[in-house]
From Swiss-Prot:
Pfam families: MinC_C, MinC_N. This is Probable septum site-determining protein MinC. InterPro entries: CAP/MinC_C, MinC, MinC_C_sf, MinC_N, Septum_form_inhib_MinC_C. It comes from Pseudomonas savastanoi pv. phaseolicola (strain 1448A / Race 6) (Pseudomonas syringae pv. phaseolicola (strain 1448A / Race 6)). SUPFAM superfamilies: Cell-division inhibitor MinC, C-terminal domain. The keyword Cell cycle applies.
Length: 246
C-alpha cells in the first residue's frame, strides 16, 4: 500500500439513519400452540402482509404469573408464517437472558425510552424572542402509474397522491395524508411519524392494511365493515380508526 493510500483511505461504508415500518407483536400469553393457530388464520386473511415482514416481539406485556417463553420456538413459529424477528422488547430477566442466548437484540419496554430528569434551575440571560422559522413543507408526491405488488412508495414530509390502482402486496407510506384515486388493494400507512391528524382517502377500500400514526386494521377487520369496497375516508380518534363514506 502506498503512503498516499494509507494517509487518505477511501471509505468502504456509510452509517445512515433510516425510517422503517416495523410490525410489533405484543404477546399476551406463552401458549405457542394457540399462537401458531391464530397466526395461520391471520396469514390466510392477508398473505401478502406476512411475507418476510420485519417484526419486534414484545414480551413486556406478559402477566407476572405467566410462565417462561420458549423464545427459539416462538421465533421459529413466526418465521414459518413469514415474520422475521429483528429484536425483542422485554423487562423480565428470564426473557432478556433467553434473547441474549440466541443473539437477539433487546429493546427497552414500551414507555421506557424516556426518563424524567430533575431540572437544575439556572438563571439565563434575558433574550429577545426570535420569530420561529416557518415549517418546511415538502410538495405533495403524485404517482400516476399503477403501483405493483412488492413496490414501496414513501412521501417524506408531506402527502401522497396515487391516481392509479394499488395492487396487493404494494405499500404506500406518507408522513401526511394518502389519497388513492382507484382501487386500494395494498397497504396504506399515513402519518407514519406520529401525525394523528393524517387521513386516508380512497375510491375503493379493498386494502390489506390501513394505518394512521401506528394504529391499524388488517383486511380481516376491514372486510366486516359495511363500507368495504366503497369510496371512504379514514381518520383517527384516540386509538380508533374511523371509516366513513366519501
Amino acid at each position: 500500500m502506498s503512503q498516499i493510500e494509507s494517509q487518505n483511505p477511501e471509505p468502504v461504508f456509510q452509517l445512515k439513519g433510516s425510517m422503517l415500518a416495523i410490525t410489533v407483536m405484543e404477546l399476551a400469553r406463552t401458549n405457542l400452540e394457540a399462537l401458531d393457530r391464530q397466526l395461520a388464520a391471520k396469514v390466510a386473511q392477508a398473505p401478502n402482509f406476512f411475507s418476510n415482514t420485519p417484526l419486534i416481539l414484545a414480551l413486556d406485556k406478559l402477566a407476572p404469573n405467566e410462565g417462561p417463553v420458549d423464545l427459539p420456538g416462538l421465533v421459529r413459529i413466526c418465521r414459518q408464517h413469514g415474520l422475521r424477528t429483528l429484536a425483542i422488547r422485554a423487562n423480565r430477566i428470564e426473557d432478556i437472558a433467553a434473547a441474549i442466548a440466541v443473539d437477539l437484540p433487546v429493546l427497552p419496554p414500551s414507555g421506557a425510552r424516556e426518563r424524567v430528569i430533575d431540572p437544575i434551575e439556572v438563571e439565563a440571560p434575558k433574550k429577545i424572542p426570535e420569530k420561529p422559522p416557518e415549517p418546511l413543507i415538502k410538495p405533495t408526491r403524485v404517482i400516476t402509474a399503477p403501483v405493483r405488488g412488492g413496490q414501496q412508495i414513501y412521501a417524506q414530509g408531506g402527502d401522497l397522491v396515487v391516481v392509479a390502482p394499488v395492487s396487493p402486496g404494494a405499500e404506500l407510506l406518507a408522513d401526511g395524508n394518502i389519497h388513492v384515486y382507484g382501487p386500494m388493494r395494498g397497504r396504506a400507512l399515513a402519518g407514519i411519524k406520529g401525525d394523528t391528524k393524517a387521513r386516508i382517502f380512497c375510491q375503493q377500500l379493498s386494502a390489506e392494511l390501513i394505518s394512521i400514526a401506528g394504529q391499524y386494521k388488517v383486511s380481516e377487520d376491514l372486510r366486516r365493515d359495511p363500507l368495504w369496497g366503497s369510496p371512504v375516508q379514514v381518520s383517527l380518534s384516540g386509538d380508533v380508526l374511523n371509516i366513513i363514506r366519501l
